[in-house]
């Protein structure tokens, strides 16, 4: 398969690109230049690997979920344990890389958006480590849902700005963070939290997250002497999935499955299934599939999980859907909750609600596969942050 994206203008087929105001164009070009240089600099790579190993705690285990495998009665189920990273999710793979890049570029301050708070915590964490000032924008609704993470960010020295505009969720936080970046561009680096935004962000985030798929490949081959037959990951903006899928894109014998949030159901207005129900448009500087009405107004995304309710999806996922290399599906709130409880009870591992969407789809897929086949789930984060809202949800039901 001949797959080499993005092209030199930052396009993934028709997707991606750089739809930014003049005021930002210089900064994204400067960032692209700095990123290219850093990737070719052995010292930078050495420093990044040092922090990934000694600070983040990589590599993360590839765990054979024996009880889940028996329960499903099909493929061997493996979990890539991104929940065991420092700060409890895959997000820090990207924030540590971008923060080192910010230091290299001579920036003193970092701005970021956050939904579930995981990216905010991971950003505040690396800013504390590297002595950078940190401002985090978070939607009002998410601030309410994720009080603990807000306190965590403040403990780490970050300033958390609550965004009341729009629906008070991730999309609105990104808007405000971009606005802030425009007016502080001389001394501030924007750490985008997913494979979104204008080029080179989708590529930078994908490349820093690819450590997930690269490790998985190596670990699975060491255990089974071959590649897995299937790989499953959840998708909001799509960074854990892109990090898991990208190293496998050329291995066509490996089936790749991306799992979106169907919320209350894709037939309702309350979902975040962008690739299932969306159409092409431009948001936050990039062309991608979006949830929008006929007038092109962005619709509200809904999911029980704060990390999946983004109304767009990364440009590379948009392309991978069109060319059929990744097959995209969606899982409802209820199915994700059921999978959350099942994994917790069967394996003693409490997954994030985001990751529970991937687990739920894997539970449908595994029984259809042969016993000598392997299925890897990207367990993108731990569920500590969700326990309170799950308790509330279950009491209401």
Curated annotation (Swiss-Prot):
Its cofactor is pyridoxal 5'-phosphate. Coiled coil: none annotated. It catalyses: (1S,2R)-1-C-(indol-3-yl)glycerol 3-phosphate + L-serine = D-glyceraldehyde 3-phosphate + L-tryptophan + H2O. Pfam families: PALP (PF00291). Pathway: Amino-acid biosynthesis; L-tryptophan biosynthesis; L-tryptophan from chorismate: step 5/5. It comes from the Bacteria. One of its GO terms (cellular component) is cytoplasm. Keywords: Amino-acid biosynthesis, Aromatic amino acid biosynthesis, Lyase, Pyridoxal phosphate, Tryptophan biosynthesis. GO terms for molecular function: tryptophan synthase activity. Its EC number is 4.2.1.20. The modification N6-(pyridoxal phosphate)lysine is found at residue 91. The beta subunit is responsible for the synthesis of L-tryptophan from indole and L-serine. Tetramer of two alpha and two beta chains. Belongs to the TrpB family. This is Tryptophan synthase beta chain. It comes from Bacillus cereus (strain Q1). The lineage of its organism: Bacteria, Bacillati, Bacillota, Bacilli, Bacillales. The gene is trpB.
